[in-house]
Amino acid sequence: ADAGMYPGIRMFTVPRVSSQTPLQDCEAAWQTATSESVGQFSAVGYFFGRMLYKALGIPVGLITPNWGGSTIEAWMTVDAIDSTPGIDHAAAKSGTYDNSIPQRLYNGMLLPVCRFTAKGFIWYQGESNRRNWYDYKALQVSLVKLWRETWGDGKMPFYYTQLAPYRYEGDDLRSLPLVIEAQYRALAEI
């Protein structure tokens, strides 16, 4: 709608690639935020970028590696999962789909963009970790540490978007609120 009013916002959508091995590059291009292009971009990412653009008055580049239904473990290395204390390591490494197998999205979608300068991260994930919510706090702390190390900045800001309440069919009604609580508790350590 009003995307054309913000010509200083640039967007880069990382293609969905699950990879067993680390990738160095991806096939994508920067786009100017227009009423047509924002519809294909992360809404959370765009609105956050628009807020930054309005507040700072400088160009803002947004990179979105996202895959709906992914687990946190897919965005981490196996080594990072193995070094996370106090979790069920077997469960954390039991993904069966491309977007839930440990380190596949880290290798295929995150590493290809780590050469770009970044000033922070926005995280909107957790719904697919409802069944192992008890490990989520520790995993999120490890993920943030890993990503900061990947970008070479141990203090890089990490923001998370609180998950929207939703009732998943056949789920324990407490599982999603417990993930939300785990995210909140992780903030004290990141």
PLM features: what roles do these ranges have?
Residues 1-190:
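Cell-envelope and extracellular/periplasmic
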